């Protein structure tokens, strides 16, 4: 068995990134337990992975600034790179991997720790290259964030034995921006988070409890996303104003997600245009509550500028909730005719779409069926089989030159 270390530096409240890594760990363990031994390496003592009652062996790695800088220099400083065999500080990350007899490391996102590996092969997930596409958003380009993101990808993507992403359109961009061979980039589609994927039976009492807990309105559109400029919350608030004033539809909006310093501005804007009573701001929501927030809504709306793929549409397909999604970056190649496409610059397009779906039950029914069919058409085992293919390919090549003592 190959010993795979899954490296985690993602917080639970990071939304889709955390849900995706949990799903990946669960599927890899379920499908390839006999061929891959999984251990977790985390830089946080608070992050304990417990999936379906199973706890994974977890090792804690915390590197201070000096230790990280040393690891970086060992790889990228020309002088240190030549001298490190003879004298220099050791690489704390590599030392731990050698101690644990790790064969391969999997980074579930673009982690700076991927730049610190010297001798251990690794796989990395790159969910998007939005910082190269939308330079106007501060969270991607200001305060040196663009340079930080681009440095990680430019140094790690070409060095990884494989890159995993979520759509062919992203694969093409990774190859173009970072000169990665397309044969080394694998596409594994998003899937619903485990809480939604495992949801089976609607419980009325639980639903009422959640309505009371969050003081939910009777009719609302749902947008689960961190509070960041590129998520386009302002657009949804404008849509609610149009729905209520132009179309006389008594509909609210429910947001949920972690605040990244932008929430107060969104709240202030909702007050300025007299929509405060129609906008409900929730924090990060626990997994068991999430399905009910979908099921009690009129629709999922995602006027985002990022991705272009995201997890919530797949969750809505599973729960048979209509999806409104930004018509950006050739996203139609991914979601096909399973979502109602909207112009993320024009709130009226979302307002008109919501009215159209509410008033046209047949159109809504067709949309729900197509979304659920698309979700069910994806061969999950085949897609995740690519991961085992990567592991076996690496082992096959190593067997041509490696001698077992």
Task: Give a label for each model feature.
Residues 1-405:
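Carbohydrate transferase catalytic cores enriched for Leloir-type hexosyltransferases
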């Amino acid at each position: 068995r190959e010993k795979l270390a899954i490296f985690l530096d993602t917080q639970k409240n990071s939304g889709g990134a955390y849900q995706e890594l949990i799903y990946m760990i669960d599927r890899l363990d379920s499908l390839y337990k006999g061929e891959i031994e999984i251990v977790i390496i985390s830089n946080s003592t608070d992050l304990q992975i417990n999936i379906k009652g199973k706890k994974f062996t977890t090792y804690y790695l915390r590197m201070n600034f000096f230790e990280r800088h040393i690891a970086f220099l060992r790889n990228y400083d020309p002088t240190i790179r030549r001298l490190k065999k003879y004298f220099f500080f050791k690489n704390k990350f590599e030392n731990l991997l050698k101690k644990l007899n790790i064969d391969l490391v999997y980074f579930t996102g673009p982690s700076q720790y991927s730049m610190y590996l010297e001798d251990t092969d690794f796989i990395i997930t790159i969910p998007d290259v939005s910082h190269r596409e939308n330079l106007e958003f501060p969270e991607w380009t200001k305060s040196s964030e663009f340079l930080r993101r681009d440095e990680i990808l430019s140094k790690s993507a070409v060095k990884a034995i494989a890159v995993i992403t979520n759509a062919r359109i992203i694969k093409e961009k990774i190859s173009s921006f970072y000169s990665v061979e397309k044969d080394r980039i694998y596409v594994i589609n998003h899937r619903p988070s485990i809480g939604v994927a495992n949801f089976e039976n609607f419980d009325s009492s639980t639903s009422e409890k959640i309505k009371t807990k969050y003081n939910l309105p009777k009719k609302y559109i749902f947008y689960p996303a961190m509070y960041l400029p590129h998520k386009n919350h302002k657009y949804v608030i404008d849509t609610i104003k149009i729905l209520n004033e132009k179309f006389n539809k008594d509909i609210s909006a429910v947001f949920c997600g972690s605040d990244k310093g932008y929430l107060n501005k969104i709240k202030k804007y909702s007050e300025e245009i007299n929509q405060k009573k129609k906008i409900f701001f929730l924090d990060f929501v626990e997994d068991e509550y999430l399905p009910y927030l979908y099921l009690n809504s009129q629709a999922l709306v995602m006027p985002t500028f990022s991705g272009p793929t995201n997890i919530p549409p797949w969750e809505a397909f599973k729960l048979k909730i209509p999806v409104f999604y930004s018509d950006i970056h050739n996203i139609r190649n991914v979601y096909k005719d399973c979502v109602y496409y909207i112009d993320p610059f024009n709130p009226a397009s979302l307002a008109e779409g919501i009215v159209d779906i509410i008033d046209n039950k047949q159109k809504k029914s067709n949309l729900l069926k197509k979304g659920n069919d698309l979700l069910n058409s994806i061969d999950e085992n085949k897609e995740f089989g690519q991961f085992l293919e990567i592991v076996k390919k690496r082992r096959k090549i190593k067997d041509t030159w490696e001698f077992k003592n």
